[in-house]
Amino acid sequence: LDYDHNDCDNRERLAEQHRMFYHTVRAAHPDIPIIIMSAPYAARTFFQSHPAKSRAIIRQTYQNAVTAGEWVYFIDGGMLFGADKDVALVDRIHPGDIGHLKMAHAVLQCFEDIAKHGRSQHFRKGDIH
């Protein structure tokens, strides 16, 4: 789920809509792993004046799912690029080649964990990639 990019300055609306969207997907697919990713930028932008607050809302959906025992992963978009954020985002908003590569690597880590552990007792619920 990648949801919070263009409509996230209204915190209450984002929290409610993100929660509802997650539950809609989960209801339709109760037995699959879901990867939740927050927006992959950390600086203020035209679309997002407080990205850390939006990430906290997205993370709360994830935490609620973990608490409920659901099969879910979280990718913190604010941590994706590290020191490379200036080259990963071509205009401080949109990922370029390096940004997409780092995003793909984070998702691949989730896929590798799913392939290796499935939803067995070895699954590390709550891990943040």
Q: Model-flagged regions — what are they?
A:
Residues 1-129:
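Alpha-helical cap/lid subdomain in secreted, periplasmic
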